[in-house]
Amino acid sequence: MIALLACMLAVAPAGSQPSQQPVGPAPAPAVVPPVAAAPTPGTPALTAADLGAWLDGNLPAALLQGKIAGVQVVVVKDGQVLVKKGYGYADVAGKKTMDVDRTLMRIGSTSKLFTWTAVLQLVEAGKIDLNADINRYLDFRITPKSGRPITMNDLMTHRAGFEEGLKDLLATDPARLKTTEAYLKENQRPQLFPAGAVPAYSNYGAALAGYIVERVSGEPFAAYVEHHILTPLQMPRTTFVQPLPRALAASMSKGYHQSNMAPGPFELVETAPAGSASTTGGDMANFMIALLQDGRFGNGQILRPETARLTRSPVIQPQPGFAAMAHGFFNERRNGKLVVGHGGDTIVFHTDMNLLPEQGVGFFVSFNSRGENDAAYGARQRLFDLFMDRYFPAPPAVTPAAIANAADHAGAIAGHYEGSRRVETGFISLFYLIQQDAITANEDGTISVSSIEDKKFREIAPNLWREVDGPRQLLVTETGGRRTIIDSANPISVMQAVPAVRNSTLNMLVGGLSVLVLLATALLWPVAAWLRRTYPGRAVVTGRAARLQFLTRLSAVGDLAYLGGWYMILAPILQSRVEVYNAGLDGWIRALQIAAIIPLAGAVIGVWNAGTTFATGRGWTARVRSVIVAAALIGIVWVAWMGALIGFDLNY
C-alpha cells in the first residue's frame, strides 16, 4: 500500500463554473480587420527577423535542458506566415531533423478544433441544432441525469456532465483500435452532473460530437474533415486516419519520453474526433489563417464569417474577464489581449495553438517529447508567456485592496477541494480521492491554492479573490449545495469542496497508518513464532482465541497481497502507459474485485478477535494491539470503498 499510495498523481485541474444554462449564444460582434498597433516604447516589433532570432535564442536551450528531442513552431500574422521553424530531431537515432512542412506531429486535443469546426459547418447546413437533445442524432440512447437533455452546446462547452474515463483511451496495437461508434457504445461514461450545470472536460463528449458529424453528414468523420476542412485549406499533410496512410507514415516524427530514450510506439487515440489528428506546422499555419480571417483562406471559405466569429463568442461566462469556452474554443485574456485556441497532449506529444484575433496573429508549437520531469509542459507554457510578454506586454498589475472581512472569508473557504473533471466510477477513482487541492488561509488574510504554486489571492470583492500582483482570479460560489471555486484561467473544470469523508488528508492518513500496522503485524508473525519456540514458558493463547489470532494475522497478509495486486494494476499510470487499460485487463481487475472479500472478511475477523481478546481477560497490551490491528483492517476497507476498489464496474 505504501507503493500504492505512491501512485497517487495529480490528475484533475481546477476550473470554471456556470452561472446559467447554455442557451443560444449571444451574437458575436463584428470583427474589424486587424490593424497593426504601434508598439509600446521599448517593445520590439513583431517581425520575422526579430521573432526568428528570439526563437533561436530560446528553443535550442529549452530542448537541451529538458531532454526534448524536437519541436515545431509557426507564427502567422496578417494572413501570412511570419516564421516557421523546426528545432532538434524528428528521429534522434536516424539524425532526421524536424521539417515544419513535412514532419508530422500528433496534436492531441488540439484536434478538437477541427471537430468543432465541422459541427459549426453542419449547423450552417441546418443539420445540427446546438440546443437540441443529442439523442436526436444518435443511434443509441444517453439517459440524461435529472431529466435535463444533453445538447451540442453542452458538448462544446464541456458541460455535458460526463465523468472522466481512462479505459480504451489510447492503444498502440492497431488490432485493438475501436471505431468511434464502438468506443462510445461500449464505454459510455456516467454523468456526474446534470447537463449544463458544471464544466467537466470530456474526451467522451468530444467524441460524441464527432460521431454526430458522421451520422448527420453520412461520411466517416476523417473523410468529412478531409473533404470539408483540410482540402479547402490546402492541408494535404493533415489527417485523422489511424494508423497513418502509407503516403504519410514515413514522415511521422518519433515520439519520446525523453530524447535520450528509445522512441515510443505510434499512439492510437480511440476517441478519434477528440485527439487523433496528425499534422505539420506548415498545414496548421493555413488553419490559423483561416480562423483569423473569419473562415477564409485564399479562395476557400470553410465557415461563414458570422459563424467563424462564434469561436470568439462564449456561450457561458461565469464572470467578466474569466476564461470561457466559445463553441469548443478556449477564450481567455492574456496581457489584456483576447487569446483563442486549444492545447493538446498525447503521452509524448505536446501541442498548443493560440490566436490573437484582434492582432491578426496565430502561434502554434508542438513538441515530440514529454521531456525530463515533464519538461515539455513547462517549456510550452513559458514559450507563449515569453512571446506575449515580449510582443504584447501587459500593463503593470495593480491588485485592489482587500475588503474588510477578507480574513474571516479566507478561513471559511479553507479546506480540501476536488476537481469536477474526475472519476467516481471504478478503481481510477482512488487517484482522485487521494490527490485534491488544498486552499489555505494565510496570516495576512490572503489564500493560497496548492495547485497554483507561488501565488496568493486577495479578496477584492465579496467572494471574488484576485492574484496579488497578477491578473488571475478565483470566484467562490455554490453548485448543487457544494461550495465551488471557479478559476479565471480554467473554463473546463471547477474545484468543489469535499465532504469530510472524502478529505484526502484523512484518507491518506487512514490508508498509510493501516498499511504500517498490517506490515508490522505480518513481519512480527514469524518473530512471535520464534519467541514461542525459544521461550516455551511464555503464556500461549489456545482454542478459539488462538484461531482468531491466526486468522487476524493471515488477514493482514491477505490485505497486503490484495493491495499489492491493485498496485500492479495502477502502476502503469506512473509510467504513462495508458494503453494497457483495455479489455485485456478486465480479467485481472475482475479477480481483484472478487478478492475484495479478503479485506471485508479481514475486518470482521479483526473486530471479532478484538472482542474475544477483551472477553477472555487478556492483558492491556494484547487488548490495545488487537484494537489497533482491527482498526487497520477496517481502515483498508474504508479506503478501498472510498476509492471504488470495491465494486464490479469494468467501465472506468
Where do the model's predicted regions map?
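Sec-dependent signal peptide recognition
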Residues: 1-6
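Short, conserved catalytic-motif segment at the N-terminal edge
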Residues: 44-105, 127-132, 136-137, 143, ...
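Peripheral terminal and inter-domain segments
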Residues: 377-652
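Short, surface-exposed loop or secondary-structure junction motifs
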Residues: 84-92, 144-357, 378, 383
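Short, well-ordered beta-strand elements
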Residues: 342, 352-369, 483-488
